[in-house]
Amino acid sequence: QMCIRDRFNAVLNILAAPFWSEDPDVYKAMISVVQKLNGHWDAFVNADLPIYDSKAKAAIDTLKKAEEWADSNGYNNGFSKVYWPQVQYAGKVYHLSTQATVTMQRVDNSHDNIPMESPSNKEIMCTAQYFGANSENEGFDQQDGNELNSKGITTAVFWGGLWVLWGPHTAYYEYGSDGVARYIFDVNIRMLMYITNGFQRRHGTQIDSTMDLSLQQSILIDEQEELDSLKGRGALIGDPTVEFLETANPTSNLMNGDFVWDISATPTPPFKSGTARVSYTDE
């Protein structure tokens, strides 16, 4: 376990390991680490699919190969985004997770570090897609990028005169499947992590204080104000709530000093697509 909080007084937000995350065992370890890191914190994984499988000694340089490799190797966890292929810029080749992590941080920073907006369709440092020195693949367009997105793979495409990161989904997503809503978009799960991590940061210093009615209500009020603030910023929609439920707090738990607050929140979804339908009229 990494002691990020202890060493840097910071909560891990994004975990990336360019190159290493192409190994399925490393990917699984990353997913395990970011769930309740040090017993408390949740974070998000940015991982790469390989453009060459060293174990199989085979190039992964087409859309079909990338989709099949991701599926057969279990790169489909909702706590992650997976990226393919690599990209070129200024004579260098970059793993796309590198560009994605920087872009995520930049977008988060534009919202005071609230992960309310997807890094998708944001400009990245790229002049071409890269599939390997010996690959015959000369690249693909946004339509092919959408095909990758439908399988939970985020990519890079030339769109609107810019090279951009393309795909707002987590690796869990597959078009047409009945899935868990919180894992559909990257902003969904990252916002929920932001809320739970924030709860612990705000109230961690109160642990082992006397839990009387005043403290219970104070936490309720503080958390509702936080949710209302996030809604006011556009990070949440609907009516987010926090409750202290009797059913979630049986006497046996209270006697042991264990208390639960239930938070319900709906992150604001991204504007994934828009269609204008035009019909002719002679009126």
Regions found by a protein language model. Name each.
Residues R7-R202:
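A glycine- and small-residue-enriched flexible loop/hinge signal that marks low-structured segments
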Residues M2-I4:
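Short, small-residue-biased leader/transition segments that mark boundaries at the very start
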Residues A47-I51, K55, D239-A248:
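Short, conserved loop-to-beta-strand elements that form functional interface hotspots
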Residues A29-I31, I219, T241-V242, T275-S279:
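Composition- and surface-driven signal marking solvent-exposed, interaction-prone regions
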Residues A16-S21, E246, A265-P267:
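Short, flexible loop/turn elements at secondary-structure junctions
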Residues A248-E283:
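C-terminal edge-of-domain segments
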Residues R182-E246:
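Acidic, low-complexity glycine/serine/threonine-rich segments
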